[in-house]
Structure formats: C-alpha cells, structure tokens
C-alpha cells in the first residue's frame, strides 16, 4: 500500500488552491490546513477572537507516543499497543502562507526557492503547544514548527538566532524573514541548517508528540529561558550605525536586567509603565491603548 501523502494537495476535489489570489489566500490556506488535519484524526476549531492563533486542533493519542501521526483514534479509549488510556492533546496553530519565490542569483541557476515569512515578538507565546505552520501552494509542503523546537533550533545555531531575534526589525517593522529556502533536492535549509525534520509527515510526528501536554509546565519554563537568551540581545542590523562599545553596553545592561529577581524586574516594569502614563502625549496613549498587545493583556495607559 502506498504511503499516505501529506498534505493532500487534492483535499478540495473541485478546486485548486492556486486559483486564489493573495487577497483571499490566507483564509483558503487555513481551510486547506484544517481539512488536512481533520483527514488524519484531528478535531479543528477556529478561535472566536483573532488573537494570533488561526486554528485550534485537538486529538486523542497514547501518552507513551505509540499513536502514529495519521492514526484516527476517535472511537478508541485505550492504546492498542500498551493498553494505556488515551489523552487529549491540543495545538494552537499560527498559519503563515506566502508565495515561494525563485532566488535570482547566478549560483542558484533557477533551482532554489525561498519562503519569506513574518514573525514579531508578540507571536512567540510561552506555550509549548503553540505551533508555527508555514505553507505555500507552490511547493505543497507543510513546515511544522512547535514553539520549543523553533526557539531551540535558533538557540543551538547561535548565528541564526542573532540574525533572527537581535535586530531592531524583530521589535519594530515587519521583520520579514527570507532565510528559509528549498533547493533542487527538496531540502529545506536556513544558512546550511536543515529544516527537513519539520516538513510534512516528519513535522506531523513532532506535532503529535504528547510530551508538550504531559510536561506543560516544564517546557513552558524552558521556553522562557530560551526567550531570555535569544530576545535580550541587541544587534544594530545592517542599516544602523552603532559603535561596538555601545552594542556591548546595551547587551551588558540586558544581562544584568534578566539576572535580577522576578520581584525587581516587576518593580522596574511598574515604574516604567508609570512613567509612560505621565510622559506620553495623549494621542500616543490612545494609539498604544488600542494596540494588539495592550488590548489583550489588559494594560491601560
């Protein structure tokens, strides 16, 4: 029997995803992702409010990892291999869809493509069940990146982490990332680092692993530590003229700040918030209060 192809490019039999333009591509892509997940046993929902999560997926799996990524166990209560009761796992999926563009370089010779996507600091939830899913109908690949795996990959490869998280565009601007590419041998790479373990069936294997639900608190703390290591570094980027001593001073300040006790950090944040309340012009306060992060975190200037 031929191995199941995932994702199924013909999940909608009467229409092709490439028939849609960029103006409605996002919604079509989310439907395409949802139907492919349903096809392998996930129950998929859409959040009532748009908080940066596009889909919520749930599935029953064996707590010891015996459930295959494409198994549908909606009618079973126990694992057929070990007899343990199944547990329900949850994934909060953020879908990123882009047109995959051909790299126009002499070296590529028309045989390499890059996937440009945008991620901002607010997208990085401190929850191991949060997942980035990158998809383009040009390659028909799902690149499935659970939060912990994504951060750990860039932490392990420090040069990638600095390029990704330390530049000003990560905190302001659109932070468009164009490092991920696919070569003529169907390998997804970022500056020589392979992303193949996150693609299609392999990515679904990672997504279906129950460890993030079973050890939720432990992996939440690990993500916090990774974010401290990756986010609290400063790099001026290519366009900003900042001296090396200034960069060193800023990074030393970050190091001191994140090593403080939680109470001291909370006190500094409270003082900073109070200064914003007193010093910001009223029109800017209004803009901040209506912004995404402040709105959903309940802060009011």
Swiss-Prot record:
Record keyword Zinc present: yes
One BP term from GO: DNA restriction-modification system
Cofactor(s) in the UniProt record: Zn(2+)
Record field: catalytic activity: Endonucleolytic cleavage of DNA to give specific double-stranded fragments with terminal 5'-phosphates
A GO MF term: type II site-specific deoxyribonuclease activity
Broad enzyme group: hydrolase
Name the record gives this protein: Type II restriction enzyme BslI subunit beta
Keywords on record: Endonuclease, Hydrolase, Metal-binding, Nuclease, Restriction system, Zinc, Zinc-finger
Effect annotated for changing residue 62 to K: Loss of activity
Note accompanying the cofactor annotation: Binds 1 zinc ion per subunit.
The EC number(s) this enzyme carries: 3.1.21.4
Zinc finger (CHC2-type): 62-82
Keyword Secreted annotated: no
Phenotype upon changing residue 66 to K: 50% of wild-type activity
Activity as a function of temperature: Is one of the thermostable restriction enzymes that remain active after 20 to 30 cycles of thermal PCR cycling.
Biotechnological relevance of this protein: Could be used to screen carcinogenic mutations in a restriction endonuclease-mediated selective PCR (or REMS-PCR) assay. In particular, could be used to detect the vast majority of mutations that occur at codons 12 or 13 of the Ras oncogenes that encode glycine (codons GGN) at those positions.
Oligomer status and interactors: Heterotetramer of two alpha and two beta subunits. The alpha subunit is believed to be responsible for DNA recognition, while the beta subunit is thought to mediate cleavage.
